[in-house]
Amino acid sequence: MSEAEYLKAVEMLNIWAKAYYTQDNPLATDIEYDVLYKKVETFENEFPDLKVSYSPTNRVGDAVSEGFEKINHKAKMWSMEDIFDDNELLAWLERGEKAGLEFFVEPKFDGASLNLTYENGVLISAGTRGNGETGENVTQNVKVINSIPLQIDYKEKIEIRGEVVIAKSDFDALNDERANSGENLFANPRNAAAGSLRQLDSAVVKSRHLKFFPWDVGENSLNFKKHSEIMEFVRNLGFLKDDFVRVCASLTDLRKAYVDLHEMRERKDILMDGMVIRINELTKCENMGYTIKFPRFMVAYKFPPVEKATKLIDINLQVGRTGVITPVGVLEPVNIDGATVRNATLHNFDEIARLGLMKGDIVSIIRSGDVIPKITGVFGARRNGSETPIKRPEFCPVCGSRLLVEDIFIRCQNLTCKARIVNSLIYFCSKKCMNIDGLGEAIINTLFEKGKIINISDIYTLKADDLEGLEGFKDKKISNLLASIENSRISPLYRFITALGIEHIGEVAARKIAEIFGENWLNASFDEILKIDGFGEAMAKSFVGFCEINREKIENLLSFLHLSAQKTEISQNVFTKKTVVITGTLSISRDEMKEKLIKMGANVTNSVSKKTDFVLFGKDAGSKLEKAKMLGVKAISEDEFKEML
């Protein structure tokens, strides 16, 4: 094969791949493709200096990365404003004189946003959205996604933006495979797509069958007048095109498009959570510009949460670290929004009574985004007499001890109950507590069953000899685990207090105790604790009682640790003593943002109420942002947050 023949073969393979992967229109048999591919591969092995970057052999996916470098986008990747009903749509249309304009609409696929950069017709880089200006360089992984061309027929520099997704059918197959391997399941296709894109091993990425759907361009030198023309041009370069793309000229057209797309929601193999509406005329878009948060010329009309009916087969009882028994509904598997739902939390037995639940009932299940599936109602009229009552338990399902009823809670009081011990160990080692990487649920259960860890202090006496010979424990894993345990010995005091799992004492309360009492925290009296801002009698009683009963165990634990309790000096600012809820994806992790806010004197909570002062939201914010709007709580974007500092 000559160099000219090689280049022609590469071109032919790319044409065939484009027809197969993006047009669903094979131009060659698998055998023809494989034979030509092998010839190209042989030539490249003989003449590696002549190999071109857009060769299909670059999609093999055998590279393992050490991590991801940062990459800057030439043009900012903006978030979109969300709307949830026709009234909000009408209000958006009335802002900025949008009447009489043409609108481009398409599905809002729920995946991971990606920015591709091409120069001289060749893919040179790919970056995740990140904070909109800087993302992670995932070029190596993107090269194994078959629906992303390595070469395009356009020589000018251009950024092409879109969504990396995984089909529902591929998602189900992936989770089945993970279940068979004993791995944790992905919550939904969006998490699977985002997680796959950030795999260090591109062979894993290739096996996930990711797809890329373009939805915009960044930096470019195109001369089109309409967004629809740009997208037609981009898709003709070899990218996927969804079968639902419309140009609408009125509110009636937009409403019809939304209804039509919503009806397709279940049938589509790609998870979508709404419809994107944007002004089609590019000059008008440019004139309208941007707010601090969003483009003024586009909006995401979100779909309502998916609700399904299924059968409640049974009730499982879970025993938490404090002994509280939580009923979990076991469901006939049902697919909701791209995820197979098999369980739903029921919180407590008062909730079961409120709903009037019986085993065998047909129930209504709702799931929105990452929210835990919830039973919202019972179809009582569909009962056939086979249903059975759900009885409150009298004995612990794990240790058999008689249970104590405290208000709405039912509790196991046996401190040696296996479930309580194991869950306490898991909580102690968790990221927000002592952050012992490698000591997760599965490993803790194994170590407990083998008698290697019976209580928390046993963690700090573990030796390599204790771990050798256990299934899955090789030298490297043992070394990493022991190093992680060693690193946890030096920790902020508040993390240790949090890790003890004292009822009513979470991270925020633990921080206050650590800052006020420092090294003398263990000797704080009921009256002293009660004086702390935000503390009530239940919190004070729980903390002091726990410390009195477990003082010897705590002091033993402290002998293994070096804890610091530095008092933070807080300068008065807009967030001091304000209650803040964080939702959505930010440019930094949620824990990092939480730490920032706490250092400014804010109280960071998990749920939105009338007492919430701010909801800080990022990309893909869900029900918390909706609730903030409903309650009139001030919602701020990350950009607004920075402006307020």
From Swiss-Prot:
What CDD domains does UniProt report for this protein, alphabetically? Answer: BRCT_DNA_ligase_like, LIGANc
Task: List the keywords (alphabetical).
Answer: DNA damage, DNA repair, DNA replication, Ligase, Magnesium, Manganese, Metal-binding, NAD, Zinc
Return the Pfam families for the record. Answer: BRCT, DNA_ligase_aden, DNA_ligase_OB, HHH_2
- Can you tell me which residues bind Zn(2+)? C396, C399, C412, C417
Which residues hold NAD(+)?
D30, I31, E32, Y33, D34, S79, M80, E106, R129, E163, K302
Q: Which GO BP terms apply? A: DNA repair; DNA replication
User: Ranges for the BRCT domain?
Assistant: 570-645
Catalytic residue list? K108 (n6-amp-lysine intermediate)
- Cellular component GO terms, alphabetically? cytosol
Example of a GO MF term: DNA binding
> EC number(s) per UniProt?
6.5.1.2
Q: Does Metal-binding count among this protein's keywords?
A: yes
Q: Which cofactor does it need?
A: Mg(2+); Mn(2+)
SMART domains cross-referenced by the UniProt entry: BRCT, HhH1, LIGANc
Q: Which InterPro entries does the record associate with it?
A: BRCT_dom (IPR001357), BRCT_dom_sf (IPR036420), DisA/LigA_HHH (IPR041663), DNA_ligase (IPR001679), DNA_ligase_AS (IPR018239), DNA_ligase_CS (IPR033136), DNAligase_adenylation (IPR013839), DNAligase_N (IPR013840)
The protein's annotated catalytic reaction(s) are: NAD(+) + (deoxyribonucleotide)n-3'-hydroxyl + 5'-phospho-(deoxyribonucleotide)m = (deoxyribonucleotide)n+m + AMP + beta-nicotinamide D-nucleotide
Q: What does this protein do?
A: DNA ligase that catalyzes the formation of phosphodiester linkages between 5'-phosphoryl and 3'-hydroxyl groups in double-stranded DNA using NAD as a coenzyme and as the energy source for the reaction. It is essential for DNA replication and repair of damaged DNA.
NCBIfam families for the chain: dnlj (TIGR00575), PRK07956.1 (NF005932)
So what family is this one in? Belongs to the NAD-dependent DNA ligase family. LigA subfamily.
The protein's name in its UniProt record? DNA ligase
